[in-house]
Amino acid sequence: MTEILEKAQKRQNELSEKINSSKEILAQRPLFHFATPGGWCNDPNGFSEFNGKIHLFYQYHPYSTQWGPMHWGHVTTKDMLTWSLEPVALAPDTNADKNGCFSGTAISTEDGRQIIAYTGVSKDGDKEIQNQCIAFGDGKTYEKFSQNPVLTAKNIPFEYQKDHFRDPKIWKKDGKFYMACVLKQLDNCGAMVIFESKDAKKWTYKGILDSSRNDFSGMWECPDVLNLDGKDMLIFSPQEMKKDYNAGFHDGNNSVYSTGILDYKKFKFFSDIRAENKCFAAQIDYGIDFYAPQTTKLSDGRTILIAWMQAWESYITPENYLWSGMMTIPRELSFKNNRLYQNPVRELENLRTDEENSEIPPEKEKTILNQQERHFELEFQVSEKTSGTIKIILGNTEDEYVLLKIDLYEQSIYFDRSKSQIPGKISERKAKLPPKEKETKIRIIGDTCSLEVFVDDGKMAFTNTFFLSKTNTDLRIKNETSQKICCKTWKLQKQEAR
């Protein structure tokens, strides 16, 4: 263990001990979502199954609650709801990555090791350089390849902006390793490039899989390549997008998916036109706080997605917190009816307790949870004939609360945290609901400081975070429609807390 890695590990231990010994701090934190053990986290990394456990690495800065020189933090889980802290996996401690170990992915090898592919950041004079590196590990400790970096500008047969070449996605197919990375072209547009290797150490450039066009975006980040229910798919997070309400995009950073055919002979991705928005890519989650999603396929056949539950554009962590950053609930993915569906992992249902059924008459308000911790699940559905709005309010007073509004007249969903502890630069978000069917189904997962909404059995997701000064609050529903609403509520508790 290098001195830099040892220092990071010591800091992680100190923060974790402080947090776990304080009931006040624990009450600030989510119950079943992963949150940084102290300090800062952003992108999920290396999300994979290895040696009987699910591994989640993440971009980690243990020395403050702001972004800083990147390390790789590491946790493991078996149920994707309870997270066990592991030693810090990577620190910026070699010439290839002395300015940061940026995002990447992980896979298992036939000899029983785990390969991490990550971006090493260094400098050439005053200029930042991003290259790709690898490390090998046993699920606990990781050793960087002595000949890092394994991919540099020398591997790419055209000019690009060398401070924007990152986020390797590594996978294996037909006995060969493949790596997809993103880079910024000289015209400032993002592109996804692909490389091939026999041993994951020496790589050959094969082509541009896909790239931005028609002023779609600037740089792309965090690529993922997968086949979901027989459909080839790319996932990436484009920057510098312009708001297009009808297409489902917002200003700044988005996270999108594209379907089509990945041709391994031409090394090109031929994308479909997405049914949701008539564009080559569609939004994955329409809320404020969702970025850099990453997937893994489990041994039980499920494809699981997890993402950073925060927005670069809107930092809202309270100043006195020892931690900043958490992940979405892991989501089971499927592709059906020509679109992506996502739902919380089925293991979440094991946390359900105290089921309550409630009716809210037309033009009435009801308190569903009274002065409770915000660990709950709420479900309701309304018929296609229902018009008006349904408001879900979390808070104790008119001075501090958050609002989720379902508008069945204009078919929209809206979140407002302007009355929360820290609204941030982006305090509200509005998005179109899917076209009406016989009924609109709403499922809401609340966990202390987040609301994740799943519409119509996972056809749409809408994720937002917030902070309130009180840990126990009311959950109220205002039914501003002409029909009664029948809803079902559960408290969500860990087994040991029951």
Segments from the language model and where they lie:
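Beta-rich carbohydrate-recognition and catalytic domains
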Residues: 1-167, 172-216, 229-286, 309-358, ...
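Beta-rich accessory regions
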Residues: 14-20, 253-498
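Short, well-structured alpha-helical interface segments that form or flank functional binding sites
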Residues: 42, 220, 290
